[in-house]
Amino acid sequence: IWSHKMRSFLTMLGIIIGIASIIAIVSTIKGTSEQIKEDLIGAGNNTVSVSLNYGDSDYDPEYGMTDGTEPPLLSDQQKEDVMNLDHVENATFFYSRTYTSSVYYENTSFQGGSIYGIDMNYLDTCGYMVRSGRGFIQKDYDEMRKVVLVDSNAADNLFAGKDPVGKTIEIGSEPFTVIGVVEQNDDYQPNIKTIDEYNQYYQMIMGTVMIPNKCWPMAFKFDEPENAVIRADSTDNMSSAGNAAAD
């Protein structure tokens, strides 16, 4: 009887160990898959960035197209087509510069960060919320008001603890009034593997200054190609949505 019970116990133990091993393997695979997704989505809001490349390099608005041709500009119809793509939940189109030496508050130069010319969809698509003051409204665009938003990192770097709202900063020799401070809803935990990813993270921690895209020519004097951020309806559809938008 004891021998029979022992064999039954060992059989059950073997089954339990086998099931536990399968669960562990499935959990490991699932965990690896989730890590890959986490690496892909970055801030966790299912967004994909699409930017203009020239050859093997990103387009640089400081120098333009090296062959002397005009850079391609997005039409309103192209933007609408992107918004209507399958699995695209939202999209935003914006100008971008990482050379911010032309941005000043009094005698403080905004170095190392980014300046964006954004549309009304940008904050929502990229997961920003207004921490103080207000965000952009339609009248800011319609009337081409020289107003600016700063994220919390730019606020710290430019204003050193002062309340930025109501202050005036200079962008490309034009005065812009700070109307709000914004920050992203989710904490971004970077997985830095390349020098480009390090540069992007460095620019992020230095901060971002945002103006209405209608005001971009005031500060930088001419039209430039726009970048896009696409928010997919799920993590699994990010790649297909991003590729469709790029096409």
What is the role of each PLM region?
Residues 11, 15, 25-28, 36:
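Juxtamembrane alpha-helical signal-transduction segment immediately C-terminal to a transmembrane helix
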Residues 121-135, 146-246:
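Mid-to-C-terminal secondary-structure elements
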